[in-house]
């Protein structure tokens, strides 16, 4: 182990599968919370729906005529995501903002516990098996074991997964940018600032809030689908509320209501998390630090990242890409 | 000439009997039996009221008279427990506010609702009605809304010029002063090209110099043929600008009439100051002198 290894690990994680999953979910949250002001504390529910739809349809229901292939399963996953958004949104979006927060955080846990306790949906063991055969079959990269990019080294499947992940992200960023510069995006931002004012100007805010919830949910579900396909495994206890809070951390770190905010946030968050972990392990390994065990490094990195975030909130509360002038305004 | 229409509307009011619920020659807004109660408290109990088209009507009354609640009910921001009301001949009882705005009835708020983290220009553009680009699908195809957006932008600039906000067009609305926010809210409402503008306490927290310019703007709005209804506490303003005054107290309309006549009305004076305001507190009349309390 040396410093080069530490950096390589950190960089490969910052652009790796986990970062992509979090980034997709956070981009959805950016539309819901950053632009529209919807307090969705259950983004994990949308991610779980995506992962489990792929897991259940591809493994549990393998060979069923209902789900002939992965592409149809993805379509179903997205439809289920829309359905979930409607179930969460219809009763709450006419009410004050806090009701959505309560309902979504509960929904996230309900969904996880239902999956965990239903054997037909994997139960406590989760679902393991081939979930992305069709996806890996169309891998256009040449047949070779490793792909090296400078110090980074990927297997043939990994390089395909990561490439598709970032292409999807780029397309969704483009979509977000196009939506948010339009009059539709302006109405969303107006709702964030003051819903009643927007209603008094003749816009249906309920419809726009529902659209934002659905769209953001679909982004999260795409993250979940990507998770199942990339990791070929779906475990109920991966879908804990902390996931959503990490997404909020990433969003605020990068700068909310900025198209590239989630990207900057996710890159920095994952780079720091892995860099601190590997760096501490390195120092323990070469004897510089003697008061820590390698097993303590996992929790300590979160403590250090937490301190870093607190410093950021004190010295740059608007996030990396945010505009301080905007934050200084009285929002209400 | 719209100015003539306004003048006609105002002169027509001279023939109207100064009684609560009086029929107007050309009513734009008619409300009947509107009732709103919170538990046992009856906040609004209006038997009949008509708002004259093309005129400036003031709705006044002491604190707690139910003016704002009545306003909220009419504009769809609160639901009435009973009653019907219509706008330009169409029944709009308990209609959602965004539908009312599309019908040409737009309101402002007592606590200004400028959208702080949007620019002044974006605030204005948000006001424009019937925008294609506000549909989610059309929004990703700029060619469907670019031309419309350009027209709205030009219209917004003209309005901002008129309200002395043009220099601020690219600033965040949150950086405006309280008075400028009032102006912005009024200008934004005009982006909808409404038939009726409802202003909830337009003068609250505005300095005297700006008050004068706000009054001029309200008159201009009428001259263009738009009907104005406003709730206000400031009596000078009411006397100055309104063509007709409706007085509410304890949820009911207690008086109506031309401004000067209404302010001399004994019922109005009683409602504001209490029926016994000019009488001594005690029979002997000297118990309020210093020293008696010690």
Regions found by a protein language model. Name each.
Chain B
Residues 75:
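Helix-to-loop junction immediately C-terminal to a conserved catalytic motif
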Residues 197-201:
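Catalytic Walker B motif of ABC-type/P-loop ATPase nucleotide-binding domains
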Residues 60-62:
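The feature captures the beta-strand-to-loop junction immediately N-terminal to the Walker
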Residues 18, 136-168, 216-219:
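Conserved ABC ATPase "signature" region
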Residues 193:
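Conserved catalytic motifs of ABC-family nucleotide-binding domains
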Residues 238-240:
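A short, surface-exposed alpha-helical micro-motif characterized by mixed small hydrophobic
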């Amino acid at each position: 182990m040396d410093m080069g290894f530490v950096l390589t690990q950190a960089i490969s994680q910052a652009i790796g599968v986990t970062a992509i999953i979090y980034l997709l979910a956070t981009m959805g949250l950016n539309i819901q919370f950053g632009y529209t002001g919807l307090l969705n504390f259950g983004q994990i529910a949308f991610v779980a729906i995506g992962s489990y739809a792929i897991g259940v349809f591809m493994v549990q229901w393998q060979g069923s005529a209902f789900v002939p292939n992965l592409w149809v399963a993805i379509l179903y996953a997205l439809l289920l995501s829309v359905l979930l958004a409607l179930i969460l949104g219809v009763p709450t979006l006419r009410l004050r903002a806090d009701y959505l927060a309560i309902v979504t955080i509960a929904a996230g846990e309900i969904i996880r516990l239902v999956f965990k306790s239903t054997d037909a949906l994997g139960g406590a063991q989760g679902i393991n098996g081939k979930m992305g055969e069709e996806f890996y079959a169309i891998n256009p990269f040449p047949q070779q074991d490793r792909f090296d990019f400078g110090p980074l080294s990927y297997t043939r499947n990994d390089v395909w997964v990561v490439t598709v992940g970032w292409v999807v992200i780029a397309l969704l960023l483009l979509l977000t940018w196009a939506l948010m510069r339009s009059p539709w995006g302006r109405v969303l931002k107006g709702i964030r600032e003051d819903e009643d004012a927007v209603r008094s100007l003749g816009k249906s805010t309920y419809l726009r809030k529902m659209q934002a919830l659905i769209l953001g949910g679909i982004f999260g579900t795409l993250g979940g689908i990507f998770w199942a396909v990339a990791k070929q495994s779906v475990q109920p206890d991966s879908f804990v509320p902390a996931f959503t809070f990490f997404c909020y951390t990433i969003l605020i770190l990068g700068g909310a209501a900025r198209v590239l905010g989630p990207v900057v946030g996710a890159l920095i968050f994952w780079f720091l998390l892995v860099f601190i972990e590997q760096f501490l392990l390195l120092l323990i390994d070469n004897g510089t630090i003697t008061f820590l065990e390698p097993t303590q490094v996992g929790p300590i990195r979160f403590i250090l990242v937490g301190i870093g975030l607190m410093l950021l909130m004190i010295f740059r509360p608007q996030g990396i890409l945010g505009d301080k002038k905007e934050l200084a305004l009285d929002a209400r | 000439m719209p100015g003539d229409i306004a003048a006609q509307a105002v002169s027509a009011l001279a023939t109207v009997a100064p009684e609560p619920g009086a029929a107007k020659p050309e009513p734009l807004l008619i409300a009947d039996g509107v009732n709103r109660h919170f538990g046992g408290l009856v906040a609004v109990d209006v038997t009949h009221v008509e708002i004259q088209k093309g005129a400036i009507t003031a709705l006044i009354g002491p604190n707690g008279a139910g003016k704002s609640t009545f306003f909220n009910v009419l504009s769809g921001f609160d639901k009435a427990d009973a009653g019907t009301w219509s706008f330009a001949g169409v029944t709009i009882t308990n209609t959602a506010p965004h539908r009312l705005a599309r019908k040409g009835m737009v309101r402002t708020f007592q606590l200004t609702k400028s959208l702080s983290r949007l620019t002044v220009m974006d605030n204005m553009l948000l006001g424009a009605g019937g925008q294609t680009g506000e549909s989610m699908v059309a929004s990703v195809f700029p060619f469907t809304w670019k031309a419309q957006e350009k027209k709205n932008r030009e219209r917004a600039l003209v309005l901002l010029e008129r309200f002395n906000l043009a220099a601020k067009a690219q600033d965040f609305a949150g950086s405006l002063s309280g008075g400028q926010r009032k102006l912005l809210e009024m200008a934004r409402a005009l982006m909808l090209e409404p038939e009726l503008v409802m202003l909830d306490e337009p003068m609250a927290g505005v300095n005297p110099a700006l008050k004068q310019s706000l009054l001029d703007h309200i008159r201009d709005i009428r001259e263009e043929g738009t009907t104005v209804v406003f709730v206000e506490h400031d009596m000078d303003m009411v006397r100055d600008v309104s063509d007709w005054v409706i007085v509410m107290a304890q949820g009911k309309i207690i008086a109506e009439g031309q401004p000067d006549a209404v302010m001399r009305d004994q019922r109005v004076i009683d409602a504001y100051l209490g029926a016994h305001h000019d009488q001594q507190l005690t029979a002997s009349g000297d118990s309020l002198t210093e020293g008696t309390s010690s």
